[in-house]
Design a protein with these regions (language model features):
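N-terminal post-signal-peptidase region of extra-cytosolic proteins
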Residues: 51-66
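Short linear sequence elements within intrinsically disordered, low-complexity coil regions
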Residues: 12, 50-51, 102-105
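Generic detector of short alpha-helix boundary/capping microenvironments
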Residues: 8, 60-61, 118
């Protein structure tokens, strides 16, 4: 009986500690980001959880109904753009998501910029301005049926970027299909950059 009481007491003490850990995001550095295909594939994007709560992140990402993501969730469609769910109250405007724009190479990741409503990607789009259009139940996460505006890259292009992430160990050469998709993407980026007003 004494052993059972002690066991219950230890569990009761451990639960608040576990809950506290789940409610605070781990420190985020360049080492927090890795080869995109080493993350968990959900439909056409990849997810992870910096707090170790990957099962819950995958469950929410796989749901069609929409609900808040757990703290520590990492979402990526392409290697250079990341969303990380921070602790509750970190930034109410972005529903506690922090946006990251990365440079990636064989040696790893470098954070080009990070923040909230001010972060833009290399295609010229403001991350928050796109994601804020997602319907409320989808926790600021875009998909083709979530209410966000269409993005200028196709599934073939995002897939090619995922499969050619330089941080990954590539054991096969780039396919003709991926090479063609990347060429098309390069033309789109060139056109977007050409349409930008000249900097003063």
């Amino acid at each position: 009986m004494k052993i059972s009481i002690l066991f219950v007491a230890l569990i009761a003490l451990a639960c608040p500690i576990a809950n506290a850990a789940d409610s605070h995001s781990a420190p985020i550095t360049e080492k927090s980001f890795k080869c995109i295909t080493d993350m968990t594939h959900v439909r056409h994007f990849y997810v992870d959880n910096l707090n170790g709560n990957l099962k819950e992140t995958v469950r929410v990402a796989s749901s069609d109904k929409g609900e808040p993501y757990p703290v520590g969730s990492v979402l990526q469609l392409v290697p250079t753009e990341v969303m990380v769910k921070r602790e509750k109250g970190f930034n109410p405007t972005t529903k506690d998501w922090e946006f990251f724009e990365l440079d990636v190479s064989k040696t790893g990741s470098t954070i080009r910029t990070r923040g909230f409503v001010e972060v833009s990607n290399r295609f010229g789009g403001n991350c928050f301005n796109c994601h804020v259009k997602a319907r409320p139940e989808f926790d600021l996460v875009c998909d083709v049926t979530h209410g966000c505006d269409p993005i200028p890259i196709t599934r073939a292009m995002s897939g090619a970027l995922q499969r050619t992430d330089p941080r990954c160990e590539h054991k096969t050469p780039i396919s003709d299909e991926d090479a063609a998709a990347l060429t098309q993407l390069g033309a789109i980026v060139k056109a977007i950059n050409a349409a930008k007003p000249p900097t003063q």
